[in-house]
Amino acid sequence: MLDLLKVSITGDLSSGKTEACRVFQDLGAYVISADKVSHSFLVPHSHIGHRVIDLLGSDVVVDNAFDRKVIAEKVFDNLVLLQALEAILHPEVCRIIEEQYCLVAKENKYPLFIAEVPLLYEIQYANKFDRVILITADENTRRERFTRKTNCSDLNFYQRCARFSSNEEKMMHADIIIENNGTKEELRHKVEEYFYALKGAL
C-alpha cells in the first residue's frame, strides 16, 4: 500500500481551484492538473488527436496544433459533442494521474499528492481519492473572475457552467469545503490550515 495521501481539489468554474493548488504547491505538496495533463497529450498526430479531429473536424487544427478556442466554440453550446470529446479525453487524463501518483508515492519526497480535477464528480472519479476538497464561491464572484480573466462574455460563462453538477450536490459528498469569496490571502490562510491537518492524516 502506498502511504501518500491522495487528495483531489474540485469546484465550479472560477471558484479558485487553481489558486488553492498553488498554495498547496508552495507548501510542498505535489500538484497535478487534469487540464494541464489533457493539454500535454492532445496533439494532432497522436491516436487521441486523430479521434478528436474525426469528432470535431480538421478546422480545430491550426499551424499543426489544436486551437483550443475553436474547440471551445464547437463544444460549449453542444452538450452531445462536449460529452463525446470528454469521453475521449477523460480516461487518458485519469490514467496519467493514477500513473503519476504511483511514481510520486514511491519517491517518498512529498507530504501530499494533490490533483486538480474540475469535473471530478461528473466523471465518477471521486472514489479514487482519499480526500476531496471542494472550493466554493458564489455565482456573481465566479462570473466576475471568469470574465475579467478571459475577456469572455457572461453567456460563455453560463455555457461552461452547464457542464458542472450542482454545487449543493457536490457539497454533500466532499470531505472538506473551502469557501472562497474573499481575497487570495484569505484563501491562503484556509488552505494552510488544511495542508497541515491533511499532512498528519496518514
Curated annotation (Swiss-Prot):
It catalyses: 3'-dephospho-CoA + ATP = ADP + CoA + H(+). Gene3D superfamilies: P-loop containing nucleotide triphosphate hydrolases (3.40.50.300). It comes from the Bacteria. InterPro entries: Depp_CoAkinase, P-loop_NTPase. It holds the Pfam family CoaE. The keyword Disulfide bond does not apply. Signal peptide: none annotated. GO terms for molecular function: ATP binding; dephospho-CoA kinase activity. SUPFAM superfamilies: P-loop containing nucleoside triphosphate hydrolases (SSF52540). Its main location: cytoplasm. GO terms for biological process: coenzyme A biosynthetic process. Pathway: Cofactor biosynthesis; coenzyme A biosynthesis; CoA from (R)-pantothenate: step 5/5. Residues 6-202 form the DPCK domain. Keywords: ATP-binding, Coenzyme A biosynthesis, Cytoplasm, Kinase, Nucleotide-binding, Transferase. Belongs to the CoaE family. PANTHER family: BIFUNCTIONAL COENZYME A SYNTHASE-RELATED, DEPHOSPHO-COA KINASE-RELATED. This is Dephospho-CoA kinase. It comes from Chlamydia felis (strain Fe/C-56).
